[in-house]
Amino acid sequence: LLQLLGSQNDMATIRLGKDRQYRKSISSLFPESRRPSGLRKTRVSYNSLAHRTTWLRSDLEDVQQGDALIVFTKRAVLDIAGRLEASGRKASVVYGSLPPEIRRRQIKLFTEGKTKVVVSTDAIGMGLNLPVRRIVFMQTDKFDGKSRRPLNVSEVKQIAGRAGRYGMYDTGYVNAMGGEALDYIRAQFENTEPKISRVSLGFPHVLLDMAEPLNTILKIWKSVEPEPPFEKISIDEILFLYERAYKAREDIDGFEDKHTLYRMLTCSIDIKNRDIVWLWLYYCQTYTADICLDFPTLEMCTDAGLMKYETYYKMLDLYHQFSNRIGKNMDVERLELEREKTEDRIMRYLVRDKKNYIQKCKYCGRTLPLGYEFRVCDQCFAASRNRKGRSR
């Protein structure tokens, strides 16, 4: 939180919840700044953050109350939660695409003891206050949008730091599934975090005043290599949306207005969700038709089950975001009502039996091993190869 006070004699205050590397960076930007004594608080000392000497078994039998199991995909979260509940252990779930209110409700179930375990992606390290006794890394690598890579020191420490809670679990524990994974997590946790050597650089809005078309400006900006320590924030999603808008440019009023177009292109949406991209483009084409945008409906979602309601919630967010960016009136009362109804539906899906989310072979229906990367079991894959061999 950056609190800027109006008077020149007042001092600006920055409250940081990050590690020492971030505080050093802020101090270097504001050399006259100081940290008031007595304000820094720690929930649990890293010295008391202990590692288990034995790793978690793949059958999940030694999962304990107060555990947080960490994976890095929504699919894996629901799979593990389903396996736990199949053995009689209720689990809360947390992942990035869940609406904030649903995360809070899931965490409330955990804090009140109605669920014994929480299964989460790395979203658990983002400001959630949990009574977690033990963090268990079920995976030690993640897909970062470009490639699959091992967790780095900062990521391990950010997640591991959720273990322990002052006055309840004074000692936090960190574990992993498998000896090799535990050795890796221990090594990363004991490593020193690298110094912050890069500063993120966003797209300069002043470039929108140039005479060139927006796509030319964006491509030129993407090709520029800034000098260290600056590193450009990716504009790949903006370019993706520009391509979609360009194909429909004849139906978009004010397409040549770079400032308006840029506000539309920078809507924060899930570009991997075809329904969300469709609705975004529809708003681009129809935003001048009335004082309000068309309100999204559940029938616009082509998914089914839980995914359908998660997509609809994203549509409601897009309606709110696009309206604000373009200056359209909103049906606020209806928006709040639809959000509440959708949150309730999502919560019902997550509270009900999760065994349907356990990953099974798409041919024979056998339960796949925990962490299995494929949709077909070894037996069916081998049988398929044998049939192909005989047909030759």
Please place each PLM-identified region on the residue numbering.
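Short glycine-/polar-rich loops that comprise or flank the Walker A/P-loop
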Residues: 8-11, 31, 39-40, 64-66, ...
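Conserved strand-helix element at the start of the C-terminal RecA-like helicase core
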Residues: 11-13, 62-87, 91-94, 231
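Conserved helicase motor
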Residues: 73-75, 93-105, 121-125
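Non-catalytic terminal extensions of ATP-dependent helicases
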Residues: 204-392
